[in-house]
Amino acid sequence: MRLSEYEHQILTKHCNALFPHSNLYLFGSRTDDKKRGGDIDLYLETEDKSNLFKRKITFLSKVKRDLGDQKIDLIFNEDESRLIEQEARQWGIRL
């Protein structure tokens, strides 16, 4: 996994604050230690869909404030038939 301990802490801190009782996964190229670069792809499983867009924007702004301007993609569990959700669940690393 190509996240520093600090990056891991920041992601989980803001996730727990804004999306309690949820599961956050890192997926995509950052899960492969042999690859370089790449954005931070996150998959979030949550049952609480209230104010989801506002909480997503708040999460991304707080993470970028703490980590600097990085490309971060955050997707939610919406439809388990979506290929991206299946890939994230199968190959993702829970944070």
Please identify what each model-predicted range represents.
Residues M1-Y25, T31-G37, T46-L95:
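Catalytic core of pol beta-like nucleotidyltransferases
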